Amino acid sequence: MMEAVLSNADHPEYGVATIPLPIPRNQYDHCVALLEALEIGDASEADCRVDSLDSAWPVLNRLVSTKVNLDELDYLAKRLDSFTVGEFSQFQAMVEKLHLTSMKDLINLTFCCQQATVITDFTNLKEVGRDHYMNIHGGCASMEELEQLDGVETAVLLIEDNEGTITRYGVVYDNGMQLSQLYDGKHLPCYHYEADMTVVGISSRWEPENSRNVTWIYLPASKGQIERAMQRSGIADPKDMRLFMADSSFPEEVDVALDFRCDNIYELNELALVADTSPLGLRIDSKRRKKLMAKRLALGHKADDHEEQGWQNGPSM
């Protein structure tokens, strides 16, 4: 966990807001309200000045005194929260090597830093060689490959044949890594952090159906989260929204029956909330099953109504 102290750079007299990172789902709207009171926290703009950042990631101190976007900062914190000890070194060393400072670059680095090799202990070359072999093979290797691998020789060849970069986090070899461009600076890539019932992508229905300009919403979500996702996609009217289903953890009986051509993100969110709050998780009791199926029928009827009206450009899921 991290903790960021954010302020309005234009009006420091407004005070500060302390935001936990990653933001717990049930605190998201409250955190947004704290920032709105300072006249910051825009859904798309980087308008939050970082006064301080308390985290286990020293390299992130470069964000202090810069302006960031709340959702980008939250997304980065979620990505880093899942990192292993090895990735901890890889990310920080590559940030320093590449002199990265923008949130876009930092987020993109989380998707590719695993390709780099960082040596923090030169006394165990066997382990260094083994780690390097895994890094350049996408983190995958069979037991037979690893048993036959000469870790010491692999490490020596790496050190002798390549120029490493000395950082505060170890000597890093990029192994030809190219900075990922998965994040375009507006549409955060789909990433499961918490257990969710379903993930829905939204885009303007004026976008091509195969458009990659998709903003992801993890249901159930608060009304504020849905509205901010719409703002990030430039959608002012829910009627102009196209929905895409990424995956689902709905109970099988609902997942199979549900017509995902629903055009109402709020009703789909209600369905996810009913399923998520069932006493036995995905094992729905009879009372809640009736509520789920009632929701399903309501959503399905609305989708059928659109078809009868000859609606051609509606949501596809």
Name each model feature, range by range.
Residues F122-V199, W206-V214:
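Extended, well-ordered protein cores
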Residues D150, K290-H301, H306-M317:
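Non-Sec secretion/translocation targeting segments of pathogen effectors
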Residues V68, N162-I166, A303:
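Mixed-charge, low-complexity intrinsically disordered regions
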Residues E39, L80, E87, L98, ...:
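Short, flexible helical or helix-coil boundary motifs
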Residues M94-V128:
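Phosphate/anion-contacting hairpin/loop surfaces
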Residues Y28-S102, G224-R289:
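Structured domain cores in non-transmembrane regions
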Residues M1-S44, D196-I235:
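N-terminal ordered "arm"
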Residues H11-V16, A56-V59, L179-Q181, E207-N213, ...:
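Short, surface-exposed beta-strand/loop "edge" segments at domain boundaries and coil↔beta transitions
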